[in-house]
């Protein structure tokens, strides 16, 4: 859903910079491109009853797919200033209209069916860096990054249109559905209801402070005017989100790792599950939506290289779950983690095997709402026998030639949509990715 770019470098937990650079080339402009195609099938599963927003067993499409093509253009403006723009095309059709699950099995899938393809500007922003001193750091050429030199202590300001996941809840091992884990609740923190339109992008500003092994980030960005829709409140005054994250780089037995702590608050037009429970008959979120509703939450996010070939990650995320999901998915608490093994162990340097899991849950008031037949943008079986939604994901990513990768991905999901009367269901995906 939200499109980020990460690299699988020599160390499992890697940086895109050199603290003591041996080369210091800088660029005035650059251009990159990526293309990703994902096709997914699912098996038949136990389906004793269904509701309006159920994952369908019979009567669903036989194959879901998505495709994206993104251009990355960057230009140097003046000292410390850069401008980036990303034109993008998307085509896709999800299983069951993207309903019946919280951990959607394709991280590239947007909210809604798009056939034929749509075209839009995914990102358009300016970045200003103010160097404050310290060691020289060389930032390598890449998507949305000009090759340049900065100092280890610096302030970076970004303003425009971007994805919050470009900056927050990063993780070298699990962050990019184009090259890593596919499931929504494994690729990022499931309970992080990050501000975004239905394509995964937002508008606003980010400020970052870097000093050696510490990084502090804060952002004020737009939320959708109506939950899970495309239209954002670009005034940043009525429907908005604030987040702060601190990151620390560390060493464990001489192996690199990172720990991140993120807090967020969403302020916008949302309905309260508790308010619906006073209604007679089937509860309805739309009728209790109110402006100025708040949702708060946090994320703890760690990654660690264990050996030169093996890395691990773990995330715990939580939000208060009192109000409806405004931008991501129906999860109010989530534990996810996994391991990635590099192919250098079997002389395939750029291959990787990943094994990950997610255990997702929702607030008690949402459980009661769904049991009484209520609907959310993602869930609604007519009733439910609640249990956590549990997903196991396994993938093998094979390097084909420079910039090209093919991935075979398997996911096993228990209790889809938090309903232990339904499922389990298995998904098999093939992903083709190219970047230049």
Task: For each feature predicted by the language model, list its residue ranges.
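Short loop/turn motifs that connect adjacent beta-strands in outer-membrane beta-barrel proteins
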Residues: 10, 15, 19-31, 42-44, ...
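N-terminal regions that are enriched for targeting/export leaders
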Residues: 10-80, 86-88, 368-370, 377-379
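Residues that define the transmembrane beta-barrel architecture of outer-membrane proteins
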Residues: 27, 63-69, 117-122, 199-203, ...
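Surface-exposed coil loops of outer-membrane beta-barrel proteins
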Residues: 100-116, 136-241, 245, 284, ...
């Amino acid at each position: 859903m939200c499109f980020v770019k990460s690299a699988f470098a020599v160390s499992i937990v890697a940086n895109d910079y050199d603290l003591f650079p041996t080369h210091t080339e800088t660029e005035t402009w650059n251009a990159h491109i990526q293309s990703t195609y994902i096709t997914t099938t699912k098996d038949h599963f136990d389906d004793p009853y269904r509701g309006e927003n159920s994952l369908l067993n019979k009567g669903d499409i036989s194959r879901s797919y998505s495709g994206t093509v993104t251009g990355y253009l960057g230009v140097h403006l003046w000292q410390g200033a850069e401008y980036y723009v990303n034109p993008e095309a998307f085509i896709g059709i999800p299983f069951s209209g993207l309903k019946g699950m919280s951990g959607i099995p394709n991280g590239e899938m947007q909210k809604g069916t798009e056939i034929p393809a749509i075209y839009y500007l995914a990102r358009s922003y300016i970045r200003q860096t103010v160097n404050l001193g310290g060691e020289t750091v060389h930032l390598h050429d890449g998507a949305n990054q000009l090759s340049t030199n900065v100092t280890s202590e610096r302030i970076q300001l970004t303003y425009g249109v971007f994805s919050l996941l470009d900056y927050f809840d990063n993780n070298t091992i699990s962050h990019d559905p184009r090259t890593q884990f596919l499931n929504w609740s494994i690729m990022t923190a499931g309970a992080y209801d990050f501000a975004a339109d239905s394509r995964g992008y937002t508008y606003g500003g980010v400020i970052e402070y870097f000093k050696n092994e510490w990084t502090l980030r804060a952002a004020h960005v737009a939320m959708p005017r109506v939950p899970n829709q495309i239209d954002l409140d670009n005034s940043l005054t009525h429907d908005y989100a604030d987040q702060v994250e601190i990151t620390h780089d560390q060493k464990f037995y001489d192996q690199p790792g990172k720990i991140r702590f993120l807090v967020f608050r969403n302020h916008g037009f949302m309905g309260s599950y508790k308010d619906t429970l006073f209604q007679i008959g089937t509860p309805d979120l739309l009728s209790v939506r109110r402006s100025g509703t708040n949702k708060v939450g946090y994320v703890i996010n760690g990654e660690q290289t264990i050996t030169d070939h093996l890395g691990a990650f773990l995330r715990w995320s939580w939000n208060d779950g009192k109000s409806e999901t405004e931008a991501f998915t129906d999860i109010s608490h989530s534990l996810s983690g996994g391991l990635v093994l590099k192919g250098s162990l079997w002389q395939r340097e750029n291959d990787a095997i990943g094994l990950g899991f997610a255990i997702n849950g929702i607030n008690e008031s949402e459980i009661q709402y769904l049991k009484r037949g209520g609907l959310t943008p993602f869930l609604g079986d007519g009733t439910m026998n609640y249990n956590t939604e549990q997903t196991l994901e396994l993938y093998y990513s094979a390097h084909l030639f420079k910039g090209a990768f093919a991935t075979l991905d398997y996911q096993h999901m228990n209790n889809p949509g938090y309903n232990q009367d339904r499922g389990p269901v298995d998904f098999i995906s093939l992903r083709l990715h190219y970047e230049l």
